[in-house]
Regions:
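Amphipathic alpha-helical segments used for helix-helix packing
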Residues: 100-121, 175-179
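Basic, helix-initiating cap at the start of DNA-binding domains
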Residues: 1-27, 36, 40, 81
Length: 210
């Protein structure tokens, strides 16, 4: 790591992550390289190595930032509401997920590569952000569904978070994929991120009432 203030180091890392995010809007994960990232920053590829050893570490930092932003929304739901019905709680969580399409894309398509090819200390930092999202959803359930037991909450978590892996591929379908589904005679109803997430949340909340 080059010498400099913590603020300067953080700013440089942020610039690199922002460049990666910009490329990810139009390029696939496999096509994005440190060289390509360097083209949209003030850094050379060699300079980037001062902050990240692999492109996967840059993506992991982007992934962590997505969880941080989702956590802010979850905390705001917790702090800005005193009482929420099941429908209201499901709606607010679904909206927060709808805002994090990039998180869902990384989760479903690139999670393994990012974790495998990143240094342990960076993976630990990411896991803290991920762990905070688990904690925040638990806090929401404890506040707005006080009837749910610890086991109920645990069941909810271990269904909903794995479910999140499938949201992006089920809602971000290309024209080519749609044409193939139609040609194959597959009867499929396309849903938005919000619709799919809301339906799952409502089902889980209702199950816990039985």
């Amino acid at each position: 790591m080059p010498k400099g203030s913590p603020e300067l180091t953080a700013a440089r890392k942020e610039e690199i992550v922002n460049a990666c995010e910009k490329l990810y809007q139009t390029m696939s994960f496999k096509d994005i390289t440190l060289k390509e990232i360097g083209k949209v920053t003030t850094f050379t590829r060699t300079s980037i190595y001062n902050y990240f050893q692999t492109k996967e570490e840059i993506f992991l930092a982007l992934y962590e930032r997505e969880y941080d932003r989702w956590n802010l929304e979850l905390v705001s739901i917790l702090e800005e509401n005193e009482v929420l019905s099941d429908k209201e709680l499901a709606d607010k969580i679904a909206v927060s997920i709808e805002h994090r399409a990039q998180l869902l894309k990384l989760l479903s398509m690139n999670n393994y590569d990012m974790e495998k090819n990143s240094r342990p200390e960076l993976l630990v930092s990411f896991k803290k952000a991920y762990g905070a999202s688990l904690t925040n959803v638990k806090r929401l359930l404890k506040k707005f569904r006080p009837d749910m037991s610890e086991q109920d909450i645990r069941n909810f978590i271990y269904i909903f978070f794995p479910f999140m892996f499938g949201i992006y591929p089920y809602t971000s379908v290309t024209d080519k994929q749609k044409a193939a589904m139609e040609a194959a005679g597959v009867d499929y109803v396309y849903q938005s991120i919000y619709e799919l997430t809301y339906s799952c949340l409502m089902m889980l909340l209702r199950i816990q009432q039985l």
